[in-house]
């Protein structure tokens, strides 16, 4: 390769490189912004101040709050039912271990009753 062909190559490829560099830079920036989808954690400066994104964020927060409240209600109900069942089992065990021979456990009402009078007793 002659030395005179090097300046000719630079004259041809330098403008191409100058045009290609900003395009390559822009492609990388677009590829990075394409990874920021809804629900992912992305940081942007001043770009999301439009009313639609604020409304979507408000609706998302409201939906999360409603779901959280509903989950708490379901958990409280399950805990309440478990406590009720647990107390009934403890009362049944106490009735069965009672020294009173006339005490028996009534499963329908979940009470310890006296065989003779039918009244509730505390063993």
From Swiss-Prot:
It comes from the Bacteria. The keyword Signal applies. Residues 1-31 form the signal peptide. Residues 47-66 are annotated as: Disordered. InterPro entries: DUF1283. It holds the Pfam family DUF1283. Keywords: Signal. Disulfide bonds: none annotated. Belongs to the UPF0482 family. This is UPF0482 protein YE2026.
């Amino acid at each position: 390769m002659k030395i005179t062909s090097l300046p000719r190559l630079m004259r041809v490829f330098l403008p191409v490189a100058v045009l290609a560099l900003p395009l390559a830079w822009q492609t990388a920036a677009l590829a990075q912004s394409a990874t920021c989808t809804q629900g992912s954690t992305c940081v942007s400066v001043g770009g999301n101040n439009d009313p639609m994104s604020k409304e979507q964020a408000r609706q998302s927060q409201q939906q999360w709050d409603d779901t959280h409240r509903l989950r708490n209600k379901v958990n409280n109900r399950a805990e309440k039912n478990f406590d009720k069942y647990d107390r009934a089992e403890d009362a049944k065990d106490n009735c069965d271990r009672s020294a009173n021979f006339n005490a028996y456990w009534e499963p329908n009402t979940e009470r310890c009753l006296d065989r003779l009078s039918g009244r509730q007793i505390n063993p």
